[in-house]
Amino acid sequence: MKQQLSVILNLSLVSGFVILGVSVISPVLPQYALSFSIPVALVGWAVSAFALARVVMDIPAGFVADRFGRKKNMMFGLVLIVLSSIAAGTASNYAWLIFARIIGGIGSALYMTSAATWIAQISAGPSRGRYMSLYSGLVFAGTAFGPTIGGYTAAHFGLRAPFFAYAVFCLAGLIATLPLKEPMDSSRALGSRMSMKDVLSVLSNGPFMLVNTAVLASFFLATGVRATLVPLYASLNLGLPEEKIGILLTVAAVGTAISTFPSGWLSDKVGRKIPMMACLFLTGIASLLIPSQESVAGLMGIMAFYGLAMGLHGSIAAWPADMAPEGKLGTSMGVYRVMGDIGMVLGPITVTYVADYAGNSTVTFTPFLVPAVIVFAVGLLMIKAKDPAARRHAEEFMAE
């Protein structure tokens, strides 16, 4: 038990370092992209290039892990992130920035897919929601401190500095990964080696894919609103500097970190569906409220509300893990990562195109409306979703 917890903590902390690095650049990435004299519509690609690479690599990352082992997969991924962060920080044009972001996304896919699968493997059972929300909570803790660090670094050392900070954090994560030992029972826990037949089998599993639409919608809103529209709105509409934008994003991330673990505990008691539906509806409401805020205090209050609401999906990875077809956990977690990353790709691109189409020099209400409508619609779809954790809890209650 202690060894299991130590592995989960290690994977969670290193994942937190990786996400800390991602969030360090979040307050400055839209403005950094604009510094290359591009239209607002192309800003979304600078944010989404990272996730687009992850979409392409999430499932192949599972094949690579089967061939070389999860630990080697994770370490190589961290090396790629370090190198790509340095490349982004030294970019001389927009194309080079996009290239660096793509390489970083490949590295992230190699690391995060293996880490999520490893944790899902060793946390099977009635406590899965709590263990996976511990992982999510530490990951979100990384997002809590990153924006403030990034905003401060950019304000004092320039827009390029956060990318070098990103490299340092991932280098620390690489060092922390060295003591981990590859699990000896991975093939038994995950089933046979991943194959395209397995991938197609998982993709054709209707109940599993329905649950993953909630994953896609949640990440669509998170990257479209928090990572893209909020920095642009704060900068273009309210004229806030990078430091204050970083604080706004930190407030949201702290709220998420606070509510994530209680949400995981709750999901083990009442099932995954109720917390996830609450997350979708409440974050949609928050998205609609953001563009009505004309003061820093008001926007900060809405971001705190948004963060607490987003944390309700603390067991977001546990639900797909519960629904994974027998013997296909590794493949299922790869598909789960793909669905989340598709949301991460589409969110920024969609909202910035909508914002650019409006033709204003500021961010209007319409770009915030689009992700809100999507999460509301998907939230209603979840009424039909299966929830094994809720069924298990009901059976245990009846047995008592």
Task: Give names to the regions the model predicted.
Residues 100-141, 318-319:
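Cytoplasmic helix-loop-helix junction between adjacent transmembrane helices
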Residues 155-167, 355-373:
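A membrane-interface helix-boundary motif in multi-pass transporters
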